[in-house]
Amino acid sequence: FVEHEKFVDLIQYVDFIYTDLKHYNTLKHKRVVGVNNHLIIKNIHYAFAQNKTIVLRIPVIPNFNDSLNDAEEFASLFNSLNIDEVQLLPFHQFGENKYKLLGRRYEMEGIKALHPEDLYDYQQIFLDHDIHCYF
């Protein structure tokens, strides 16, 4: 997450970008992430327009963005931005210990990790929208 003007200044020095988009819906994104997604989407679009190599990732999170409707909405957004590739990151519990070490409550405690085989139908929606989608 970075202001667009700073992103424009910085991108001339960057060849490869990893970026995550956690939700297509601005209100849901802001509620969970703490910021809306307008700036993130604007920066992603700008980077693609500059022909930068980008790995756009969706962390697929249970009860947040894991429904087939969510996949449809992401795919529609990506089609509108001419984005033709996305990596799915199935939810895992790797961060749980970090929260404990920081003395913070882990909101996802007890939530089952996802695996690629859990997301084949989700992945297929992107493929049906001509978006190369992989894990």
Where are each of the predicted segments found?
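Conserved AdoMet/S-adenosylmethionine-binding subsite of the radical SAM
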Residues: 1-94
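Auxiliary Fe-S-binding modules of radical SAM enzymes
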Residues: 60-135
